């Protein structure tokens, strides 16, 4: 069964949206195999956003991700990467449709409540970063 990495970002945690986001995931029929609330280190944030390391907004991404606790999730289900991305919505709040998590809750490009892996390969990489040394198949 396919797995993906989802993360409730610091703004989502601060605004009390964890329960709403988890409920949406579970209502879709997906199973949360693992979940942890944690304070992200600068090293983990840099590794997570490594693909953006040369971009001018990289520092802002790292600062935001380390600004408060996050909830990291290992989620399993059929076609979970693609379906969860549709549930999340577009990165830009103005482009995210109502009914998507970002369409309903995002404020800005960076304060967009949630992260979700954009491919099976990204999911494997991100799950390895966030749940180190733990098996991908539960």
From Swiss-Prot:
Compartments, record wording: Cytoplasm
Keywords of the record: ATP-binding, Cytoplasm, Kinase, Magnesium, Metal-binding, Nucleotide metabolism, Nucleotide-binding, Phosphoprotein, Transferase
Enzyme class: transferase
EC number: 2.7.4.6
Broad class of where this protein is predominantly found: cytoplasm
Record-linked Pfam families: NDK
Cofactor requirement: Mg(2+)
Catalytic activity: a 2'-deoxyribonucleoside 5'-diphosphate + ATP = a 2'-deoxyribonucleoside 5'-triphosphate + ADP; a ribonucleoside 5'-diphosphate + ATP = a ribonucleoside 5'-triphosphate + ADP
One annotated GO molecular function: metal ion binding
GO biological process: CTP biosynthetic process; GTP biosynthetic process; UTP biosynthetic process
Domain of life: Bacteria
Active site: 115
General function of this protein: Major role in the synthesis of nucleoside triphosphates other than ATP. The ATP gamma phosphate is transferred to the NDP beta phosphate via a ping-pong mechanism, using a phosphorylated active-site intermediate.
Subunit structure: Homotetramer.
Family that this chain belongs to: Belongs to the NDK family.
Protein name (record): Nucleoside diphosphate kinase
Encoding gene (name): ndk
């Amino acid at each position: 069964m396919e797995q993906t990495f989802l993360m409730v970002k610091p703004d989502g945690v601060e605004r009390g949206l964890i329960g709403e986001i988890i409920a949406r995931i579970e209502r879709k029929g997906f199973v949360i195999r693992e979940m942890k609330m944690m304070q992200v280190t600068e090293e983990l944030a840099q590794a997570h956003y490594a693909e953006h390391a040369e971009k001018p907004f990289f520092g802002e991404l790292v600062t935001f991700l380390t600004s408060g606790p996050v909830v990291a999730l290992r989620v399993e289900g059929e076609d979970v990467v693609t379906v969860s991305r549709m549930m999340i919505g577009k990165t830009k709040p103005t482009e995210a449709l109502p009914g998507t998590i970002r369409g309903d809750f995002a404020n800005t490009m960076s304060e967009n409540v949630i992260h979700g892996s954009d491919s099976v390969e990204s999911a494997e990489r991100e799950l390895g970063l966030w749940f180190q040394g733990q098996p991908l198949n539960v």
